[in-house]
Amino acid sequence: MNEEGGYLGAMTYQCLYSPVMEKIKQQHRDDPRASLALNKLHTALTTCEQASPSFLYDFTKVLLDDSELSVNLQESYLRMHDTSPTNDLIVSGYEQNADYKELTKRAIELRRVLSRVPEEMSDRHAFLETIKLIASSIKKLLEAINAVYRIVPLTAQPAVEKRKREFVHYSKRFSNTLKTYFKDQNANQVSVSANQLVFQTTMIVRTINEKLRRG
């Protein structure tokens, strides 16, 4: 698995297939046979994702290659984060806890504001305003992570701290990529860095969920 397949692969079901599946389910909600078939397909896709996070990504690339469509996957994924489901950013079983709710809120906000990057890069003023919002969202998410760190079980703290350090690392990388962009105008590299930051945001919540399930 290459690096792109790693972070985009892990987001493929949530970003691409889940919204499509939900739309089709709604269209056929009055057809029991169709609903049963769609549920089986949903189970098969999620099983594939769990067994091999890059499978759906690789499958999507094959479909695109066979259809001879030219699609910038980095930009497309980033745009889709604006409307993709957010259940992967919820701390399951702790939805009413103020600190976990704040973490979810800030994670969603960061993902949504990052999704605006491709649309606004061509307008320097709008892009600079979006960059300010991203910086503010990163700061608020870090504050939420610190608050959650204090209430998770002691056994979970090292893993949360590790994810936080990785998030900070990719936040700095994103900042450096933006500085470079204003010199070389490499828009795709900005999308790459933004997607990596979205992935790190997801991994923070995923790690917290895993540690809380284990107690």
UniProtKB/Swiss-Prot annotation:
According to UniProt, the tissues expressing it are described as:
Expressed in pharynx, intestine, germline, vulva and excretory canals.
A Pfam family cross-referenced in the UniProt record is PDCD10_N
Q: Which family does it belong to?
A: Belongs to the PDCD10 family.
Instruction: Write the protein's name.
Output: Programmed cell death protein 10 homolog
Q: What is its main location?
A: cytoplasm
Any idea where this protein resides?
Cytoplasm; Apical cell membrane
Question: GO biological process annotations for this chain's record?
Answer: endoplasmic reticulum organization; epithelial tube morphogenesis; Golgi reassembly; positive regulation of endocytic recycling; positive regulation of GTPase activity; regulation of Golgi organization
Cellular component GO terms, alphabetical? cytoplasm; cytoplasmic side of apical plasma membrane; FAR/SIN/STRIPAK complex; growing cell tip
Q: List keywords of the entry alphabetically.
A: Cell membrane, Cytoplasm, Membrane
Q: How does it sit in the membrane?
A: Peripheral membrane protein
| Gene Ontology MF: a single term | protein kinase binding
Record note on disruption phenotype = Animals are sterile and develop slowly. Excretory canals are approximately 45% shorter and are characterized by a discontinuous and wider lumen, the presence of cysts and an increased number of canalicular vesicles which are swollen. These defects start during the L3 larval stage and become more severe when reaching adulthood. In addition, cdc-42 expression levels and activity are reduced along the excretory canal length. Animals have also a reduced distribution of Golgi and ER components along the excretory canals.
Task: Please give the function described in this protein's UniProt entry.
Answer: Involved in excretory canal elongation during postembryonic development. Plays a role in promoting Golgi stability, ER integrity and vesicle transport probably by regulating the activation of Rho GTPase cdc-42. Involved in fertility.
